[in-house]
Amino acid sequence: MITLTAGISYVDLQFQGAHRVIATAVLQGPAGIALIDPGPASSLPVLRETLKRAGIGVADVTALLLTHIHLDHAGGCGVLLRENPKLKVFVHMKGAPHMINPEKLLASASRLYGDAMDRLWGDVLPVPEGALTILQGGERIEAGGRSLRVEYTPGHASHHVSYFCQDARIAFVGDTAGVKVVPEGAVWPPTPPPDIDLEAWSESLSRIEGFGAETIFLTHFGPVSPVGSHVSALRENLTNASRLAKESLARDGTDEEREAWFVDECRRALQHTMDENNARLYEAAGRFDLSWRGLARYWRKRAG
């Protein structure tokens, strides 16, 4: 595990064998251990082994804190509940029904990932309703020995929350503050369907800035500071990506051709600032074809 500060660490889940794609934060206190975004079931062997080396078993974990329910963040929860039925799972109210019955979530994901579902995500099992603590935003919760402020931060997903640890000055922001898998690289907005909302996203970024955190923690990937310049860069790239998607919709041709054009433009933008291998990590964290679909859906809904 990589230490952030006393009692707060994180695990590189080595998703699909790649480093710096998905991070799980670990909060350790005398009353128990909390994991923020435990990741997909396919990465649980790495999570278990890394925790074990730190002297932590799944039975020692008391809480799973979800920023949102996308499979790369929350897909492993049901398996962990089978191993430790005493776990409490904190989740936004809009995501809770899909944790209890993941059938619709899996159907939606299957349309995006097709035959790669099992390889990418592993077993996605239901979470018992009694294990859930439902969040709306505005709460203060205790988990992993820390007092955490919860804020509703939609835009990337309608069921997204962020957690702010006041004493450590760290905000755990999931995907709302984007993807930055290379420390010196760009910050990129993941915009998959179905509920991208650019106006809500902008408000959520202002809410994150309002925490006054010294560090924000991205699930993709890890701690980032200073916060202000990171958020400014994300706003700029979110504007650029949404503009590209809008431009693509005005192009002649099929949606497949529009999507391919958008993907090429995103790759070109990233490869101006880093080598091809690092640029590929960004696609592992948030595929550009899916980002086009999310933004295209947003613009088409706006057009009526």
Task: List the predicted regions and their residue ranges.
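Divalent metal-coordination and catalytic microenvironments
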Residues: 7, 27, 37, 47, ...
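Metallo-beta-lactamase
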Residues: 33, 40-42, 60-72, 99-152, 158-228
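Metal-dependent catalytic neighborhoods of phosphoester/phosphodiester hydrolases
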Residues: 75-84, 102
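Histidine/acidic-residue-rich catalytic or RNA/ligand-binding cores of hydrolases
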Residues: 227-236
